[in-house]
Curated annotation (Swiss-Prot):
It holds the Pfam family SepF. It is found in: Cytoplasm. GO terms for biological process: division septum assembly; FtsZ-dependent cytokinesis. Residues 23-32 have a biased composition (Basic and acidic residues). Cell division protein that is part of the divisome complex and is recruited early to the Z-ring. Probably stimulates Z-ring formation, perhaps through the cross-linking of FtsZ protofilaments. Its function overlaps with FtsA. InterPro entries: Cell_div_SepF, Cell_div_SepF/SepF-rel, SepF-like_sf. It comes from Listeria welshimeri serovar 6b (strain ATCC 35897 / DSM 20650 / CCUG 15529 / CIP 8149 / NCTC 11857 / SLCC 5334 / V8). Homodimer. Interacts with FtsZ. This is Cell division protein SepF. Residues 23-42 are annotated as: Disordered.
Amino acid sequence: MGLSNKFKSFFFLDEEEEYYEEEVAREPEPMQKKTKKEKPSKNRFYAVEEEDAKVVSMQGAQYSSRMVLAEPRVYAEAQELADYLKDYKTVVVNLQRISHDQATRIVDFLSGTVYALGGDIQRVGNNIFLCTPDNVEVNGSISEMLDEQNFM
């Protein structure tokens, strides 16, 4: 028994030395209310997102009032046009004074940009394109009207 008491005292605390840790009662944290927000997509379907209820400033809605008219001469100017789109500015691109290969590359680059930003690109004339960010909605089509009036 003496040996077992030595093991107990070595590995375990003696009854006199036992330490009890009292748990401090925490105050419950207030829960944030989750709200479901309907977000319209391009196909007029509604995607439901769950997000925290927060107050957001409406400064983003003011960016849609800017429009940039551009007539690039080289492919390197496509990045500047993409930066305008990232800043929520509508861009009208006239590609009539650039080679066909360069124009194709610019349209491909801008198509990828507007896709990534959730925007849209439309042909509005012969080598003229309208690129819009996601906060701009375009109704109608000029190309169809031009075809009807034989302008092309």
